[in-house]
Every structure is written in C-alpha cells, then in structure tokens.
Curated annotation (Swiss-Prot):
Residues 1-117, 161-621 are cytoplasmic. ATP binds at G54, S55, P56, G57, T58, G59, K60, S61. ATP-dependent serine protease that mediates the selective degradation of mutant and abnormal proteins as well as certain short-lived regulatory proteins. Degrades polypeptides processively. SUPFAM superfamilies: P-loop containing nucleoside triphosphate hydrolases, Ribosomal protein S5 domain 2-like. One of its GO terms (molecular function) is serine-type endopeptidase activity. It comes from Archaeoglobus fulgidus (strain ATCC 49558 / DSM 4304 / JCM 9628 / NBRC 100126 / VC-16). It is found in: Cell membrane. This is Archaeal Lon protease.
C-alpha cells in the first residue's frame, strides 16, 4: 500500500470496506461525539432527559435511537381504552403487560360475536314466525306481515345495543417490541403528539361511533417507558411546549379532541401513562424559542450536550472515518464496498470540509451523501467496488445548492464582466465570500470617496443588506487610514458598492478588501485585478483569520484569478484537491501593509504610502 494512503487511513491495511468490522450497537457506531455518548449512557441508566444542540448531520437522531437500545430492560405495557357506562365522554384507561392487550381485545371480540350471532338468530326467528303466522292465518295480509318483519329488524337495530360497543380499543401495542420504544415526533402537530379524538359525523340515531373507539394515542403515549425524540423543538408552539412540560412532570396525560369544532372535543379520557425520556434536539437558535420552564426541566433533570462539528485529525479518528464509510455501505445496502484509495479520498474530503487545520468534519450526513453518490456511480458503471475515480466523479455531481448557485454566479458574472481578472483599477478589489456553509464566490467591491455632504460628519454609504457589515468594517479601517495616510475621513463620504451582491453573504471577512478599496480610492493608487483577497482586520492593522478559506480559494481559481491573499493564520486550513492544486498563488499576510505591498500598482504614490507605513512601524518599535 502507498505510504501516503496508509497514513491517511490511520495505519489500517485492508482491501475494501468489506474487511472492516461494523459494530452492532448504534451507540458504538457514533463517531467523534465521545462527550455526548457518555452523557447518553448515563442518562439511559438513570432515565434522565437530554437536550442535544448542534449543527445538522452531527448524529443527534442517531444518539436518540441508540438511547432506546441502552435503556434498562423492564416490563413494557399495552394501553387499553374502555367505554365508561357512567360517562361515555370519559373513557377508562387500563394498563396490561405487553402482548396481553391483543389477547383481551380478541377475547372481547369473540364474546361480542357470539352474542351478536345469538341475537341475530332470535331476530330472524321472530321475523320468520311473524311472516309464517301471517301466511297461515290470512294469506291476503302477507304484505302487512312483511312490513311488520321490517319494523322488527329496524327496531332491533336502533333499540337493542350493539355488542361490539363494549369491545375495548388497543391504544398502544408493544407486543412486538424487544427493546424500549422510540418515537420520533419531529414536526408533529398537537394531535399527533398528545393524542386526539376523531370527529363523529353521525352523533345520534344509533349510528354514532362510541367515544372510546375514536380515541387515538399520541407520540408521548406510544413512547411510554421509552424515548421521545423531538428535533427542532423550538418549532413546537408555546402551548404544545407547556403540555409537553405537564406530561414530563405528571408522567401521564389525558387524550382529548384537539379541534374545538370536532365532536371529539367533548371527549376526555382518564389520564394515559406517558413515562418517557425526552431527547430534544436543535441548533443554537432552538434555545431562543424554547419555553423557559421546559428547558429548566431538562437542565434540572437531565443533561445538555453541545455536539462537536469537528474532531482532531489523528490516526485513531481517521480509522473511525474508515469505519464510517463501511457503516454507510452496510446501512444503505444498495451500493458496493469502497477500496482503500476511495476511502482515503473520502477522508481527504472530511479534512477539507472541516475548514479548520488538523481537524476532520463531523457533519457526517453530508459526507454520507458523497459516499452514496460515489456508490451509485460505481453501480451504474457495473463496478463491484467503489474506486477513487468514482469518488472524484461524485464530488463534481454531489454539490450543494449553494455550490451550484456559486458556479452559476461566477459563470454569469464572467459573461457580463462584473468582476475583472486583469489590469489595474482605482478603488476596485476582488473580495471573497462564502454562501451558506460550503460555497465560495468572488465578491467585487468598489469604493469611492467624496467630500462630505454633511457639515457635521462624513457617512458610510453601502448597498442593501451589507450596510451594517460595511459600516463596521469601515469604522475599523478608518483608524488605519488616519494613522498610515494622515487623512481624516470624518469629513468625507465613503461610498462602498458590493457589485452583484448575493443574498446570504455575511461576516467581516471582507474587511481587508474594503480597507484596500478605500485606501486605493483616497490615495488614487490602482489595485491589481488579478488578485483576490479575504481576511478580517483589527484597528491596529493586523490581518485576522476567517472561515471557509478553501472554498474561497476554489472560487478564485474558478473565476480565473492568479493570486489570492489570505490571513497567515489560515495557511494550514488550505486543503485544495488535486483538481485545484497549483492553479493559483496563495499569499499569506499578517498586516494590512503586506496586503497593500502585493496589490497596489508600483509607482511614486505607492512608494510614498509604503514609506509612511515603514516609518510608523519603526517609530512603534
């Protein structure tokens, strides 16, 4: 095996993922979330609630399912609902051991059937006797005999109660469950979560459906003695969160009709047991939308866990990613196994997507999508194993919407020349930004400086949504401009345009781009348009690290730029694949004067400006 590939695979030697053992228990399949796994294990033993907060695709739902497997084995129960003769609108609830519920219902049905058969036999015997008596005594009155028989049948239907009305309904059936129940109630409406009573269109005349037969269990009741999982818990209404809190506290919750206009609203069962463990999940914004009392309940009687987005790039963790690929193949069941070179490419992609030096991404759902796409390509080509070329093809196909939009963005901007890739321009810079979380774009920035229209102070005038970001960046830049150029911009209006602004561009990574454009506009020094740049900026002129440098560099390459300036602290975060390697010169910088040195056009103005920088730096030393 190639030594580089062996190193990427963490020292593992295998021919394909078929040789890699996949753990049977779900909890052992969780990768890179050691803290969360430990919390889940403790919560399962002690029956505590858990809240998992983190990015999508980091294993929250998998941990919740794993918890159901870990719960101590105890006697599961079936829940039956019976009619209440004293108050038909308050059906009775009864608990029996798992499996007994079906037996009881079948026994009641059998008994009801026997009674119905006996009743029907008596009624039809009576009907034949009436008709027979009429024919024998007075054949001319046969029609009246038939009418009498029909009346007897109708009266028996309306006035003799049906035997099946007393048959109980099996509300929760756990007869086929070996482990504790797991209920995913993500996105469930109130009726699906707390139970409901169906509407009865025929409410009289003997045609009505008994109240207990219309009762439907909710997810909280089906999760009795198991796990209730709710992702994006903040999407629940406050009213639903209050009900959920009541169910958590009382461990039982009655079922009633959820719609005021339904006849089911009049029905309210006895409290139905719902002794479940709640596993709530969501992103950081989920905390803002949670009912304070509900969060307090989880915090006081359970664990709060923040999921990792990345894990250290160590041989042990790379071995875990090898196992992850094997797990995905086994779970999917429709794609071939991967050879070692294909797995190595998946691990390289995990490094690239981490966006952080010496780390591997833990957004494994997205990485799993790449695995499945590569498997589909191999399958369509008739290959019995996934090879390196299949993964490389998959990387081009399995692009996110943001990446596809970024490709179209760059393509269209090229057509209309919205960004320039050669020559020199005053006050114009090719900045770099990220759309979403995985797609880079070139963001042309144009600055113009004019005398202030206000007698009191100058203004920062920027486009649309980027007004706030631009203002903040310029305020930081103003200190640098005053210090190094000797100009006071308080009596100037600074106009900044983000050309072809794309929705979703955020952050201050355009700070050095704005600073360069403004300094170029003030000093009248042209900027090299073959250079793109990204980086945050301190008021002291230090270039600070930013996120998504790999994606931004790839966007610069795609746009046809020759150089890219990035913060020096980000140099180890650059993980270009073979397709982009060596196609652009990457220049790491640590101060704004280094940026200007690389991008401003040579000449007297530049020399004069750079000499000011040197003088001030020497004075500071």
């Amino acid at each position: 095996m190639n030594e580089e590939v062996r190193e990427i695979l963490g020292g593992l030697d295998f021919e394909s993922t078929k040789d890699v053992a996949v753990p049977e228990r779900l909890i052992d399949q969780v990768i890179g979330q050691d803290h969360a796994v430990e919390a889940i294990k403790k919560a399962a033993v002690q029956k505590r609630h858990v809240m998992l907060i983190g990015s999508p695709g980091t294993g929250k739902s998998m941990l919740a399912k794993a918890m159901a497997e870990l719960l101590p084995k105890e006697e599961l129960e079936d829940i039956l609902v019976y009619p209440n003769p004293q108050d038909p609108n308050q059906p009775k609830i009864r608990l029996v051991p798992a499996g007994k519920g079906r037996e009881i219902v079948e026994a009641y049905k059998e008994e009801a059937m026997k009674k119905a058969q006996a009743r029907n036999f008596l009624i039809f015997t009576l009907v034949f006797l009436v008709i027979g008596y009429t024919v024998l005594t007075n054949p001319g009155n046969l029609i009246w005999g038939i009418i009498a028989a029909v009346l007897i049948l109708m009266m028996s239907r309306y006035f003799i109660p049906r035997e099946d009305r007393n048959v109980p309904k099996l509300l929760v059936d756990n007869s086929d469950k070996v482990t504790a129940p797991f209920e995913d109630a993500t996105g469930a409406h109130a009726g699906a979560l707390f139970g409901d009573v169906r509407h009865d269109p025929f409410q009289s005349g003997g045609l009505e459906t008994p109240a207990h037969e219309r009762v439907e269990a909710g997810a909280i009741h089906r999760a009795h003695k198991g796990v209730l999982y709710i992702d994006e818990i903040n999407t629940l209404t406050i009213e639903s969160q209050q009900k959920l809190l009541t169910a958590l506290q009382d461990k039982k919750f009655p079922i009633t009709g959820q719609s005021e206009r339904s006849s089911g609203a009049m029905v309210r069962t006895e409290p139905v047991p719902c002794d479940f463990i709640l596993v709530a999940a969501g992103n950081l914004d989920a905390l803002m939308g949670m009912h304070p009392a509900l969060r307090s309940r989880i915090e006081g009687y359970g664990y709060e866990v923040y999921m990792n987005d990345t894990m250290p790039d160590t041989p042990e963790n790379r071995q875990k990613l090898v196992r992850f690929v094997a797990q995905e193949v086994v779970k999917d069941g429709k794609i071939p196994h991967f050879d070692k070179y294909a797995v190595a490419e998946i691990i390289k992609e995990a490094r690239r997507r981490a966006g952080r030096r010496n780390h591997l991404t833990l957004r494994l759902r997205e990485l799993g999508g790449l695995v499945r796409t590569a498997g589909d390509i191999a399958k369509s080509e008739g290959s019995d194993i996934v090879r390196l070329e299949h993964v490389l093809k998959a990387k081009k196909i399995a692009k996110t919407i943001e990446e596809q939009l970024a490709d179209k963005y760059i393509e269209r901007r090229k057509d209309y020349k919205l960004f320039i890739t050669e020559g020199y321009e005053v006050g114009r810079v090719n900045g770099l930004a990220v759309i979403g979380e995985s797609a880079g774009i070139v963001l042309p920035i144009i600055a113009e400086v004019t005398p202030s229209m206000s007698k009191s102070e100058g203004r920062v005038i920027a486009t649309g949504r980027l007004q706030e970001i631009a203002r903040e960046a310029v305020m930081n830049v103003s200190a640098i401009i005053k210090k190094y150029t000797g100009r006071d911009i308080s009596n100037m209006d600074v106009h900044i345009q983000f050309v072809g602004t794309y929705e979703g561009v955020e952050g201050d990574s355009a700070s050095i781009s704005i600073a360069t454009a403004v300094i170029s506009a003030i000093e009248g020094i042209p900027v090299d348009q073959s250079v793109a740049m990204t980086g945050s900026l301190s008021v002291k002129g230090e270039v600070l690290p930013v996120g998504g440098v790999t994606q931004k560099i790839e966007a610069a390459i795609q746009a046809g730029l020759k150089k890219v300036i990035i913060p020096k602290d980000n140099i180890d975060d650059v993980l270009l694949d073979a397709e982009h390697e060596g196609k652009i010169e990457v220049i790491p910088v640590s101060r704004i004067n280094e940026v200007l040195e690389h991008v401003l056009e040579d000449g007297k103005k530049k020399n004069r400006l750079m000499s000011k920088f040197k003088e001030l730096e020497l004075a500071a030393v």
